[in-house]
């Protein structure tokens, strides 16, 4: 999917089924390396990143069957250096390192790929593994790691909150000798889901969802069954789609408690929000949104993966709104494309200032990453005229059937 035709002047109304969380499913798939037991994982989204992860596992010797629900047997792993042509495609491939080290005592992994969003160093991953007793050599863009015997439990104070590094250390520590404490750990729902999965296999992890996670190492893990949590970012994206178009939507098979900050901001913008056990209903009919001031922060703060969508919302809102990005560098690349569509946006350091206008205009725009792709498609849906969104190959990395789901709620999007 390289290019999309997006018809504008649409009000988006209806019902959407939310897919499983990419950010939980990817690490969970790589965590299967930790055990010889048979595993069944449900609610796996159909995404290119997921498909690449599965290819990586198969390359190592893992047996996998199924589609949305996968049956996985990692008992026959006999390769410890995944190929560069796959590693280079997804940043999540770094999560193979901890499980391979913990179970087999060795791993050789090329530096990973993925979205190019500013500086995303892997130092925190490597420092954590080193503290657990691993010897790591980094040469020619390749991580060569090994440990004699088992990894050793340790108190690890993270110098900054990192979801990725928290996952790496937590996974490696499950099979370490002794106890590990991760202080200043990330608290995201995906961390909780991964810990729940590992505990199902016999790990001993407590505190996931707080800033202090305690892992008591075990000798081995077994098999088990797990259901991946819903994708909170996909949910938030569809809620913004309805809010920006002055429509109404119900998102099904989602988890409202994972979106508290996003729902608060949508309510502040003027939306009527109702929630149930596994659904969220938003109504913005007949109302132009009010502008918002937002600052991204680690969970439970406002998610960085939602700031582009809210920049779109601010662009067509009443008043002046700001968004400050504190997690990643260079995550405002998409704003130049919104400006092409008539948005009035200024960048000042790590903050964008949006001067709301009533209507965007169609244009020929280019997406720079996953969330930018979704944002520009939504912008095309509400703009006047026909918008062509280029480089939408990013989209299938993190949104399952996004154009199809939007078309079901009133959009007119075609693949060119």
UniProtKB/Swiss-Prot annotation:
Record-linked Pfam families: EPSP_synthase
Catalyses which reaction(s): phosphoenolpyruvate + UDP-N-acetyl-alpha-D-glucosamine = UDP-N-acetyl-3-O-(1-carboxyvinyl)-alpha-D-glucosamine + phosphate
Cell location: Cytoplasm
Main location: cytoplasm
EC number of this enzyme: 2.5.1.7
Pathway the protein acts in: Cell wall biogenesis; peptidoglycan biosynthesis
Protein task: Cell wall formation. Adds enolpyruvyl to UDP-N-acetylglucosamine.
Homology family: Belongs to the EPSP synthase family. MurA subfamily.
Name of this protein: UDP-N-acetylglucosamine 1-carboxyvinyltransferase
Species, as recorded: Buchnera aphidicola subsp. Acyrthosiphon pisum (strain APS) (Acyrthosiphon pisum symbiotic bacterium)
Gene that encodes the chain: murA
């Amino acid at each position: 999917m390289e290019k999309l035709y997006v018809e504008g002047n649409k009000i988006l109304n209806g019902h959407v089924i939310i897919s499983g969380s990419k950010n939980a499913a990817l690490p969970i798939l790589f965590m299967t390396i930790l055990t010889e037991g048979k595993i069944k994982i449900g609610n796996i989204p159909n995404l290119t990143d997921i498909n690449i992860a599965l290819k990586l596992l198969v390359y190592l010797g893992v047996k996998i069957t199924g589609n949305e629900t996968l049956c996985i047997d990692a008992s026959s792993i006999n390769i410890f250096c995944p190929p560069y042509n796959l590693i280079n495609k997804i940043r999540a491939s770094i999560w193979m390192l901890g499980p391979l080290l913990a179970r087999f005592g060795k791993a050789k992994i090329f530096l990973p790929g993925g979205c190019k969003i500013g500086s995303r160093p892997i130092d925190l991953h490597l420092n954590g593994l080193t503290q657990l007793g691993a010897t790591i050599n980094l040469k020619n863009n390749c991580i060569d790691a090994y440990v004699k015997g088992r990894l050793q439990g340790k108190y690890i104070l993270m110098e900054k909150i990192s979801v990725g590094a928290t996952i790496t250390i937590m996974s490696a520590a499950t099979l370490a000798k002794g106890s590990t404490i991760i202080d200043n750990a990330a608290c995201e729902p995906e961390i909780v889901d991964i810990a729940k999965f590992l505990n199902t296999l016999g790990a001993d992890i407590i505190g996931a969802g707080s800033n202090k996670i305690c892992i008591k190492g075990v000798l081995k893990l077994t098999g088990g069954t797990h259901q991946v949590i819903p994708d909170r970012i996909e949910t938030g994206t569809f809620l913004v789609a309805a809010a920006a178009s002055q429509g109404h939507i119900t998102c099904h098979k989602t988890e409202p408690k994972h979106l508290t900050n996003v729902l608060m901001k949508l309510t502040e913008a003027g939306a009527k929000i109702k929630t149930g056990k596994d659904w969220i209903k938003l109504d913005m009919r007949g109302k132009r949104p009010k502008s918002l001031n937002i600052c991204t922060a680690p969970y439970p703060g406002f998610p960085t993966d939602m700031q582009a969508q809210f920049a779109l919302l601010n662009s067509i809102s009443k008043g002046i709104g700001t968004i400050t990005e504190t997690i990643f560098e260079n995550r405002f690349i998409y704003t130049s494309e919104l400006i092409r569509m008539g948005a009035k946006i200024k960048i000042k350091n790590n903050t964008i200032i949006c001067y709301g206008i009533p209507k965007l205009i169609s244009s020929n725009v280019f997406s720079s990453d996953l969330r930018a792709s979704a944002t520009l498609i939504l912008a095309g849906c509400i703009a006047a005229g026909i918008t062509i969104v280029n480089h939408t190959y990013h989209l299938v990395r993190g949104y399952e059937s996004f154009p199809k789901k939007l078309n079901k709620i009133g959009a007119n999007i075609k693949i060119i």
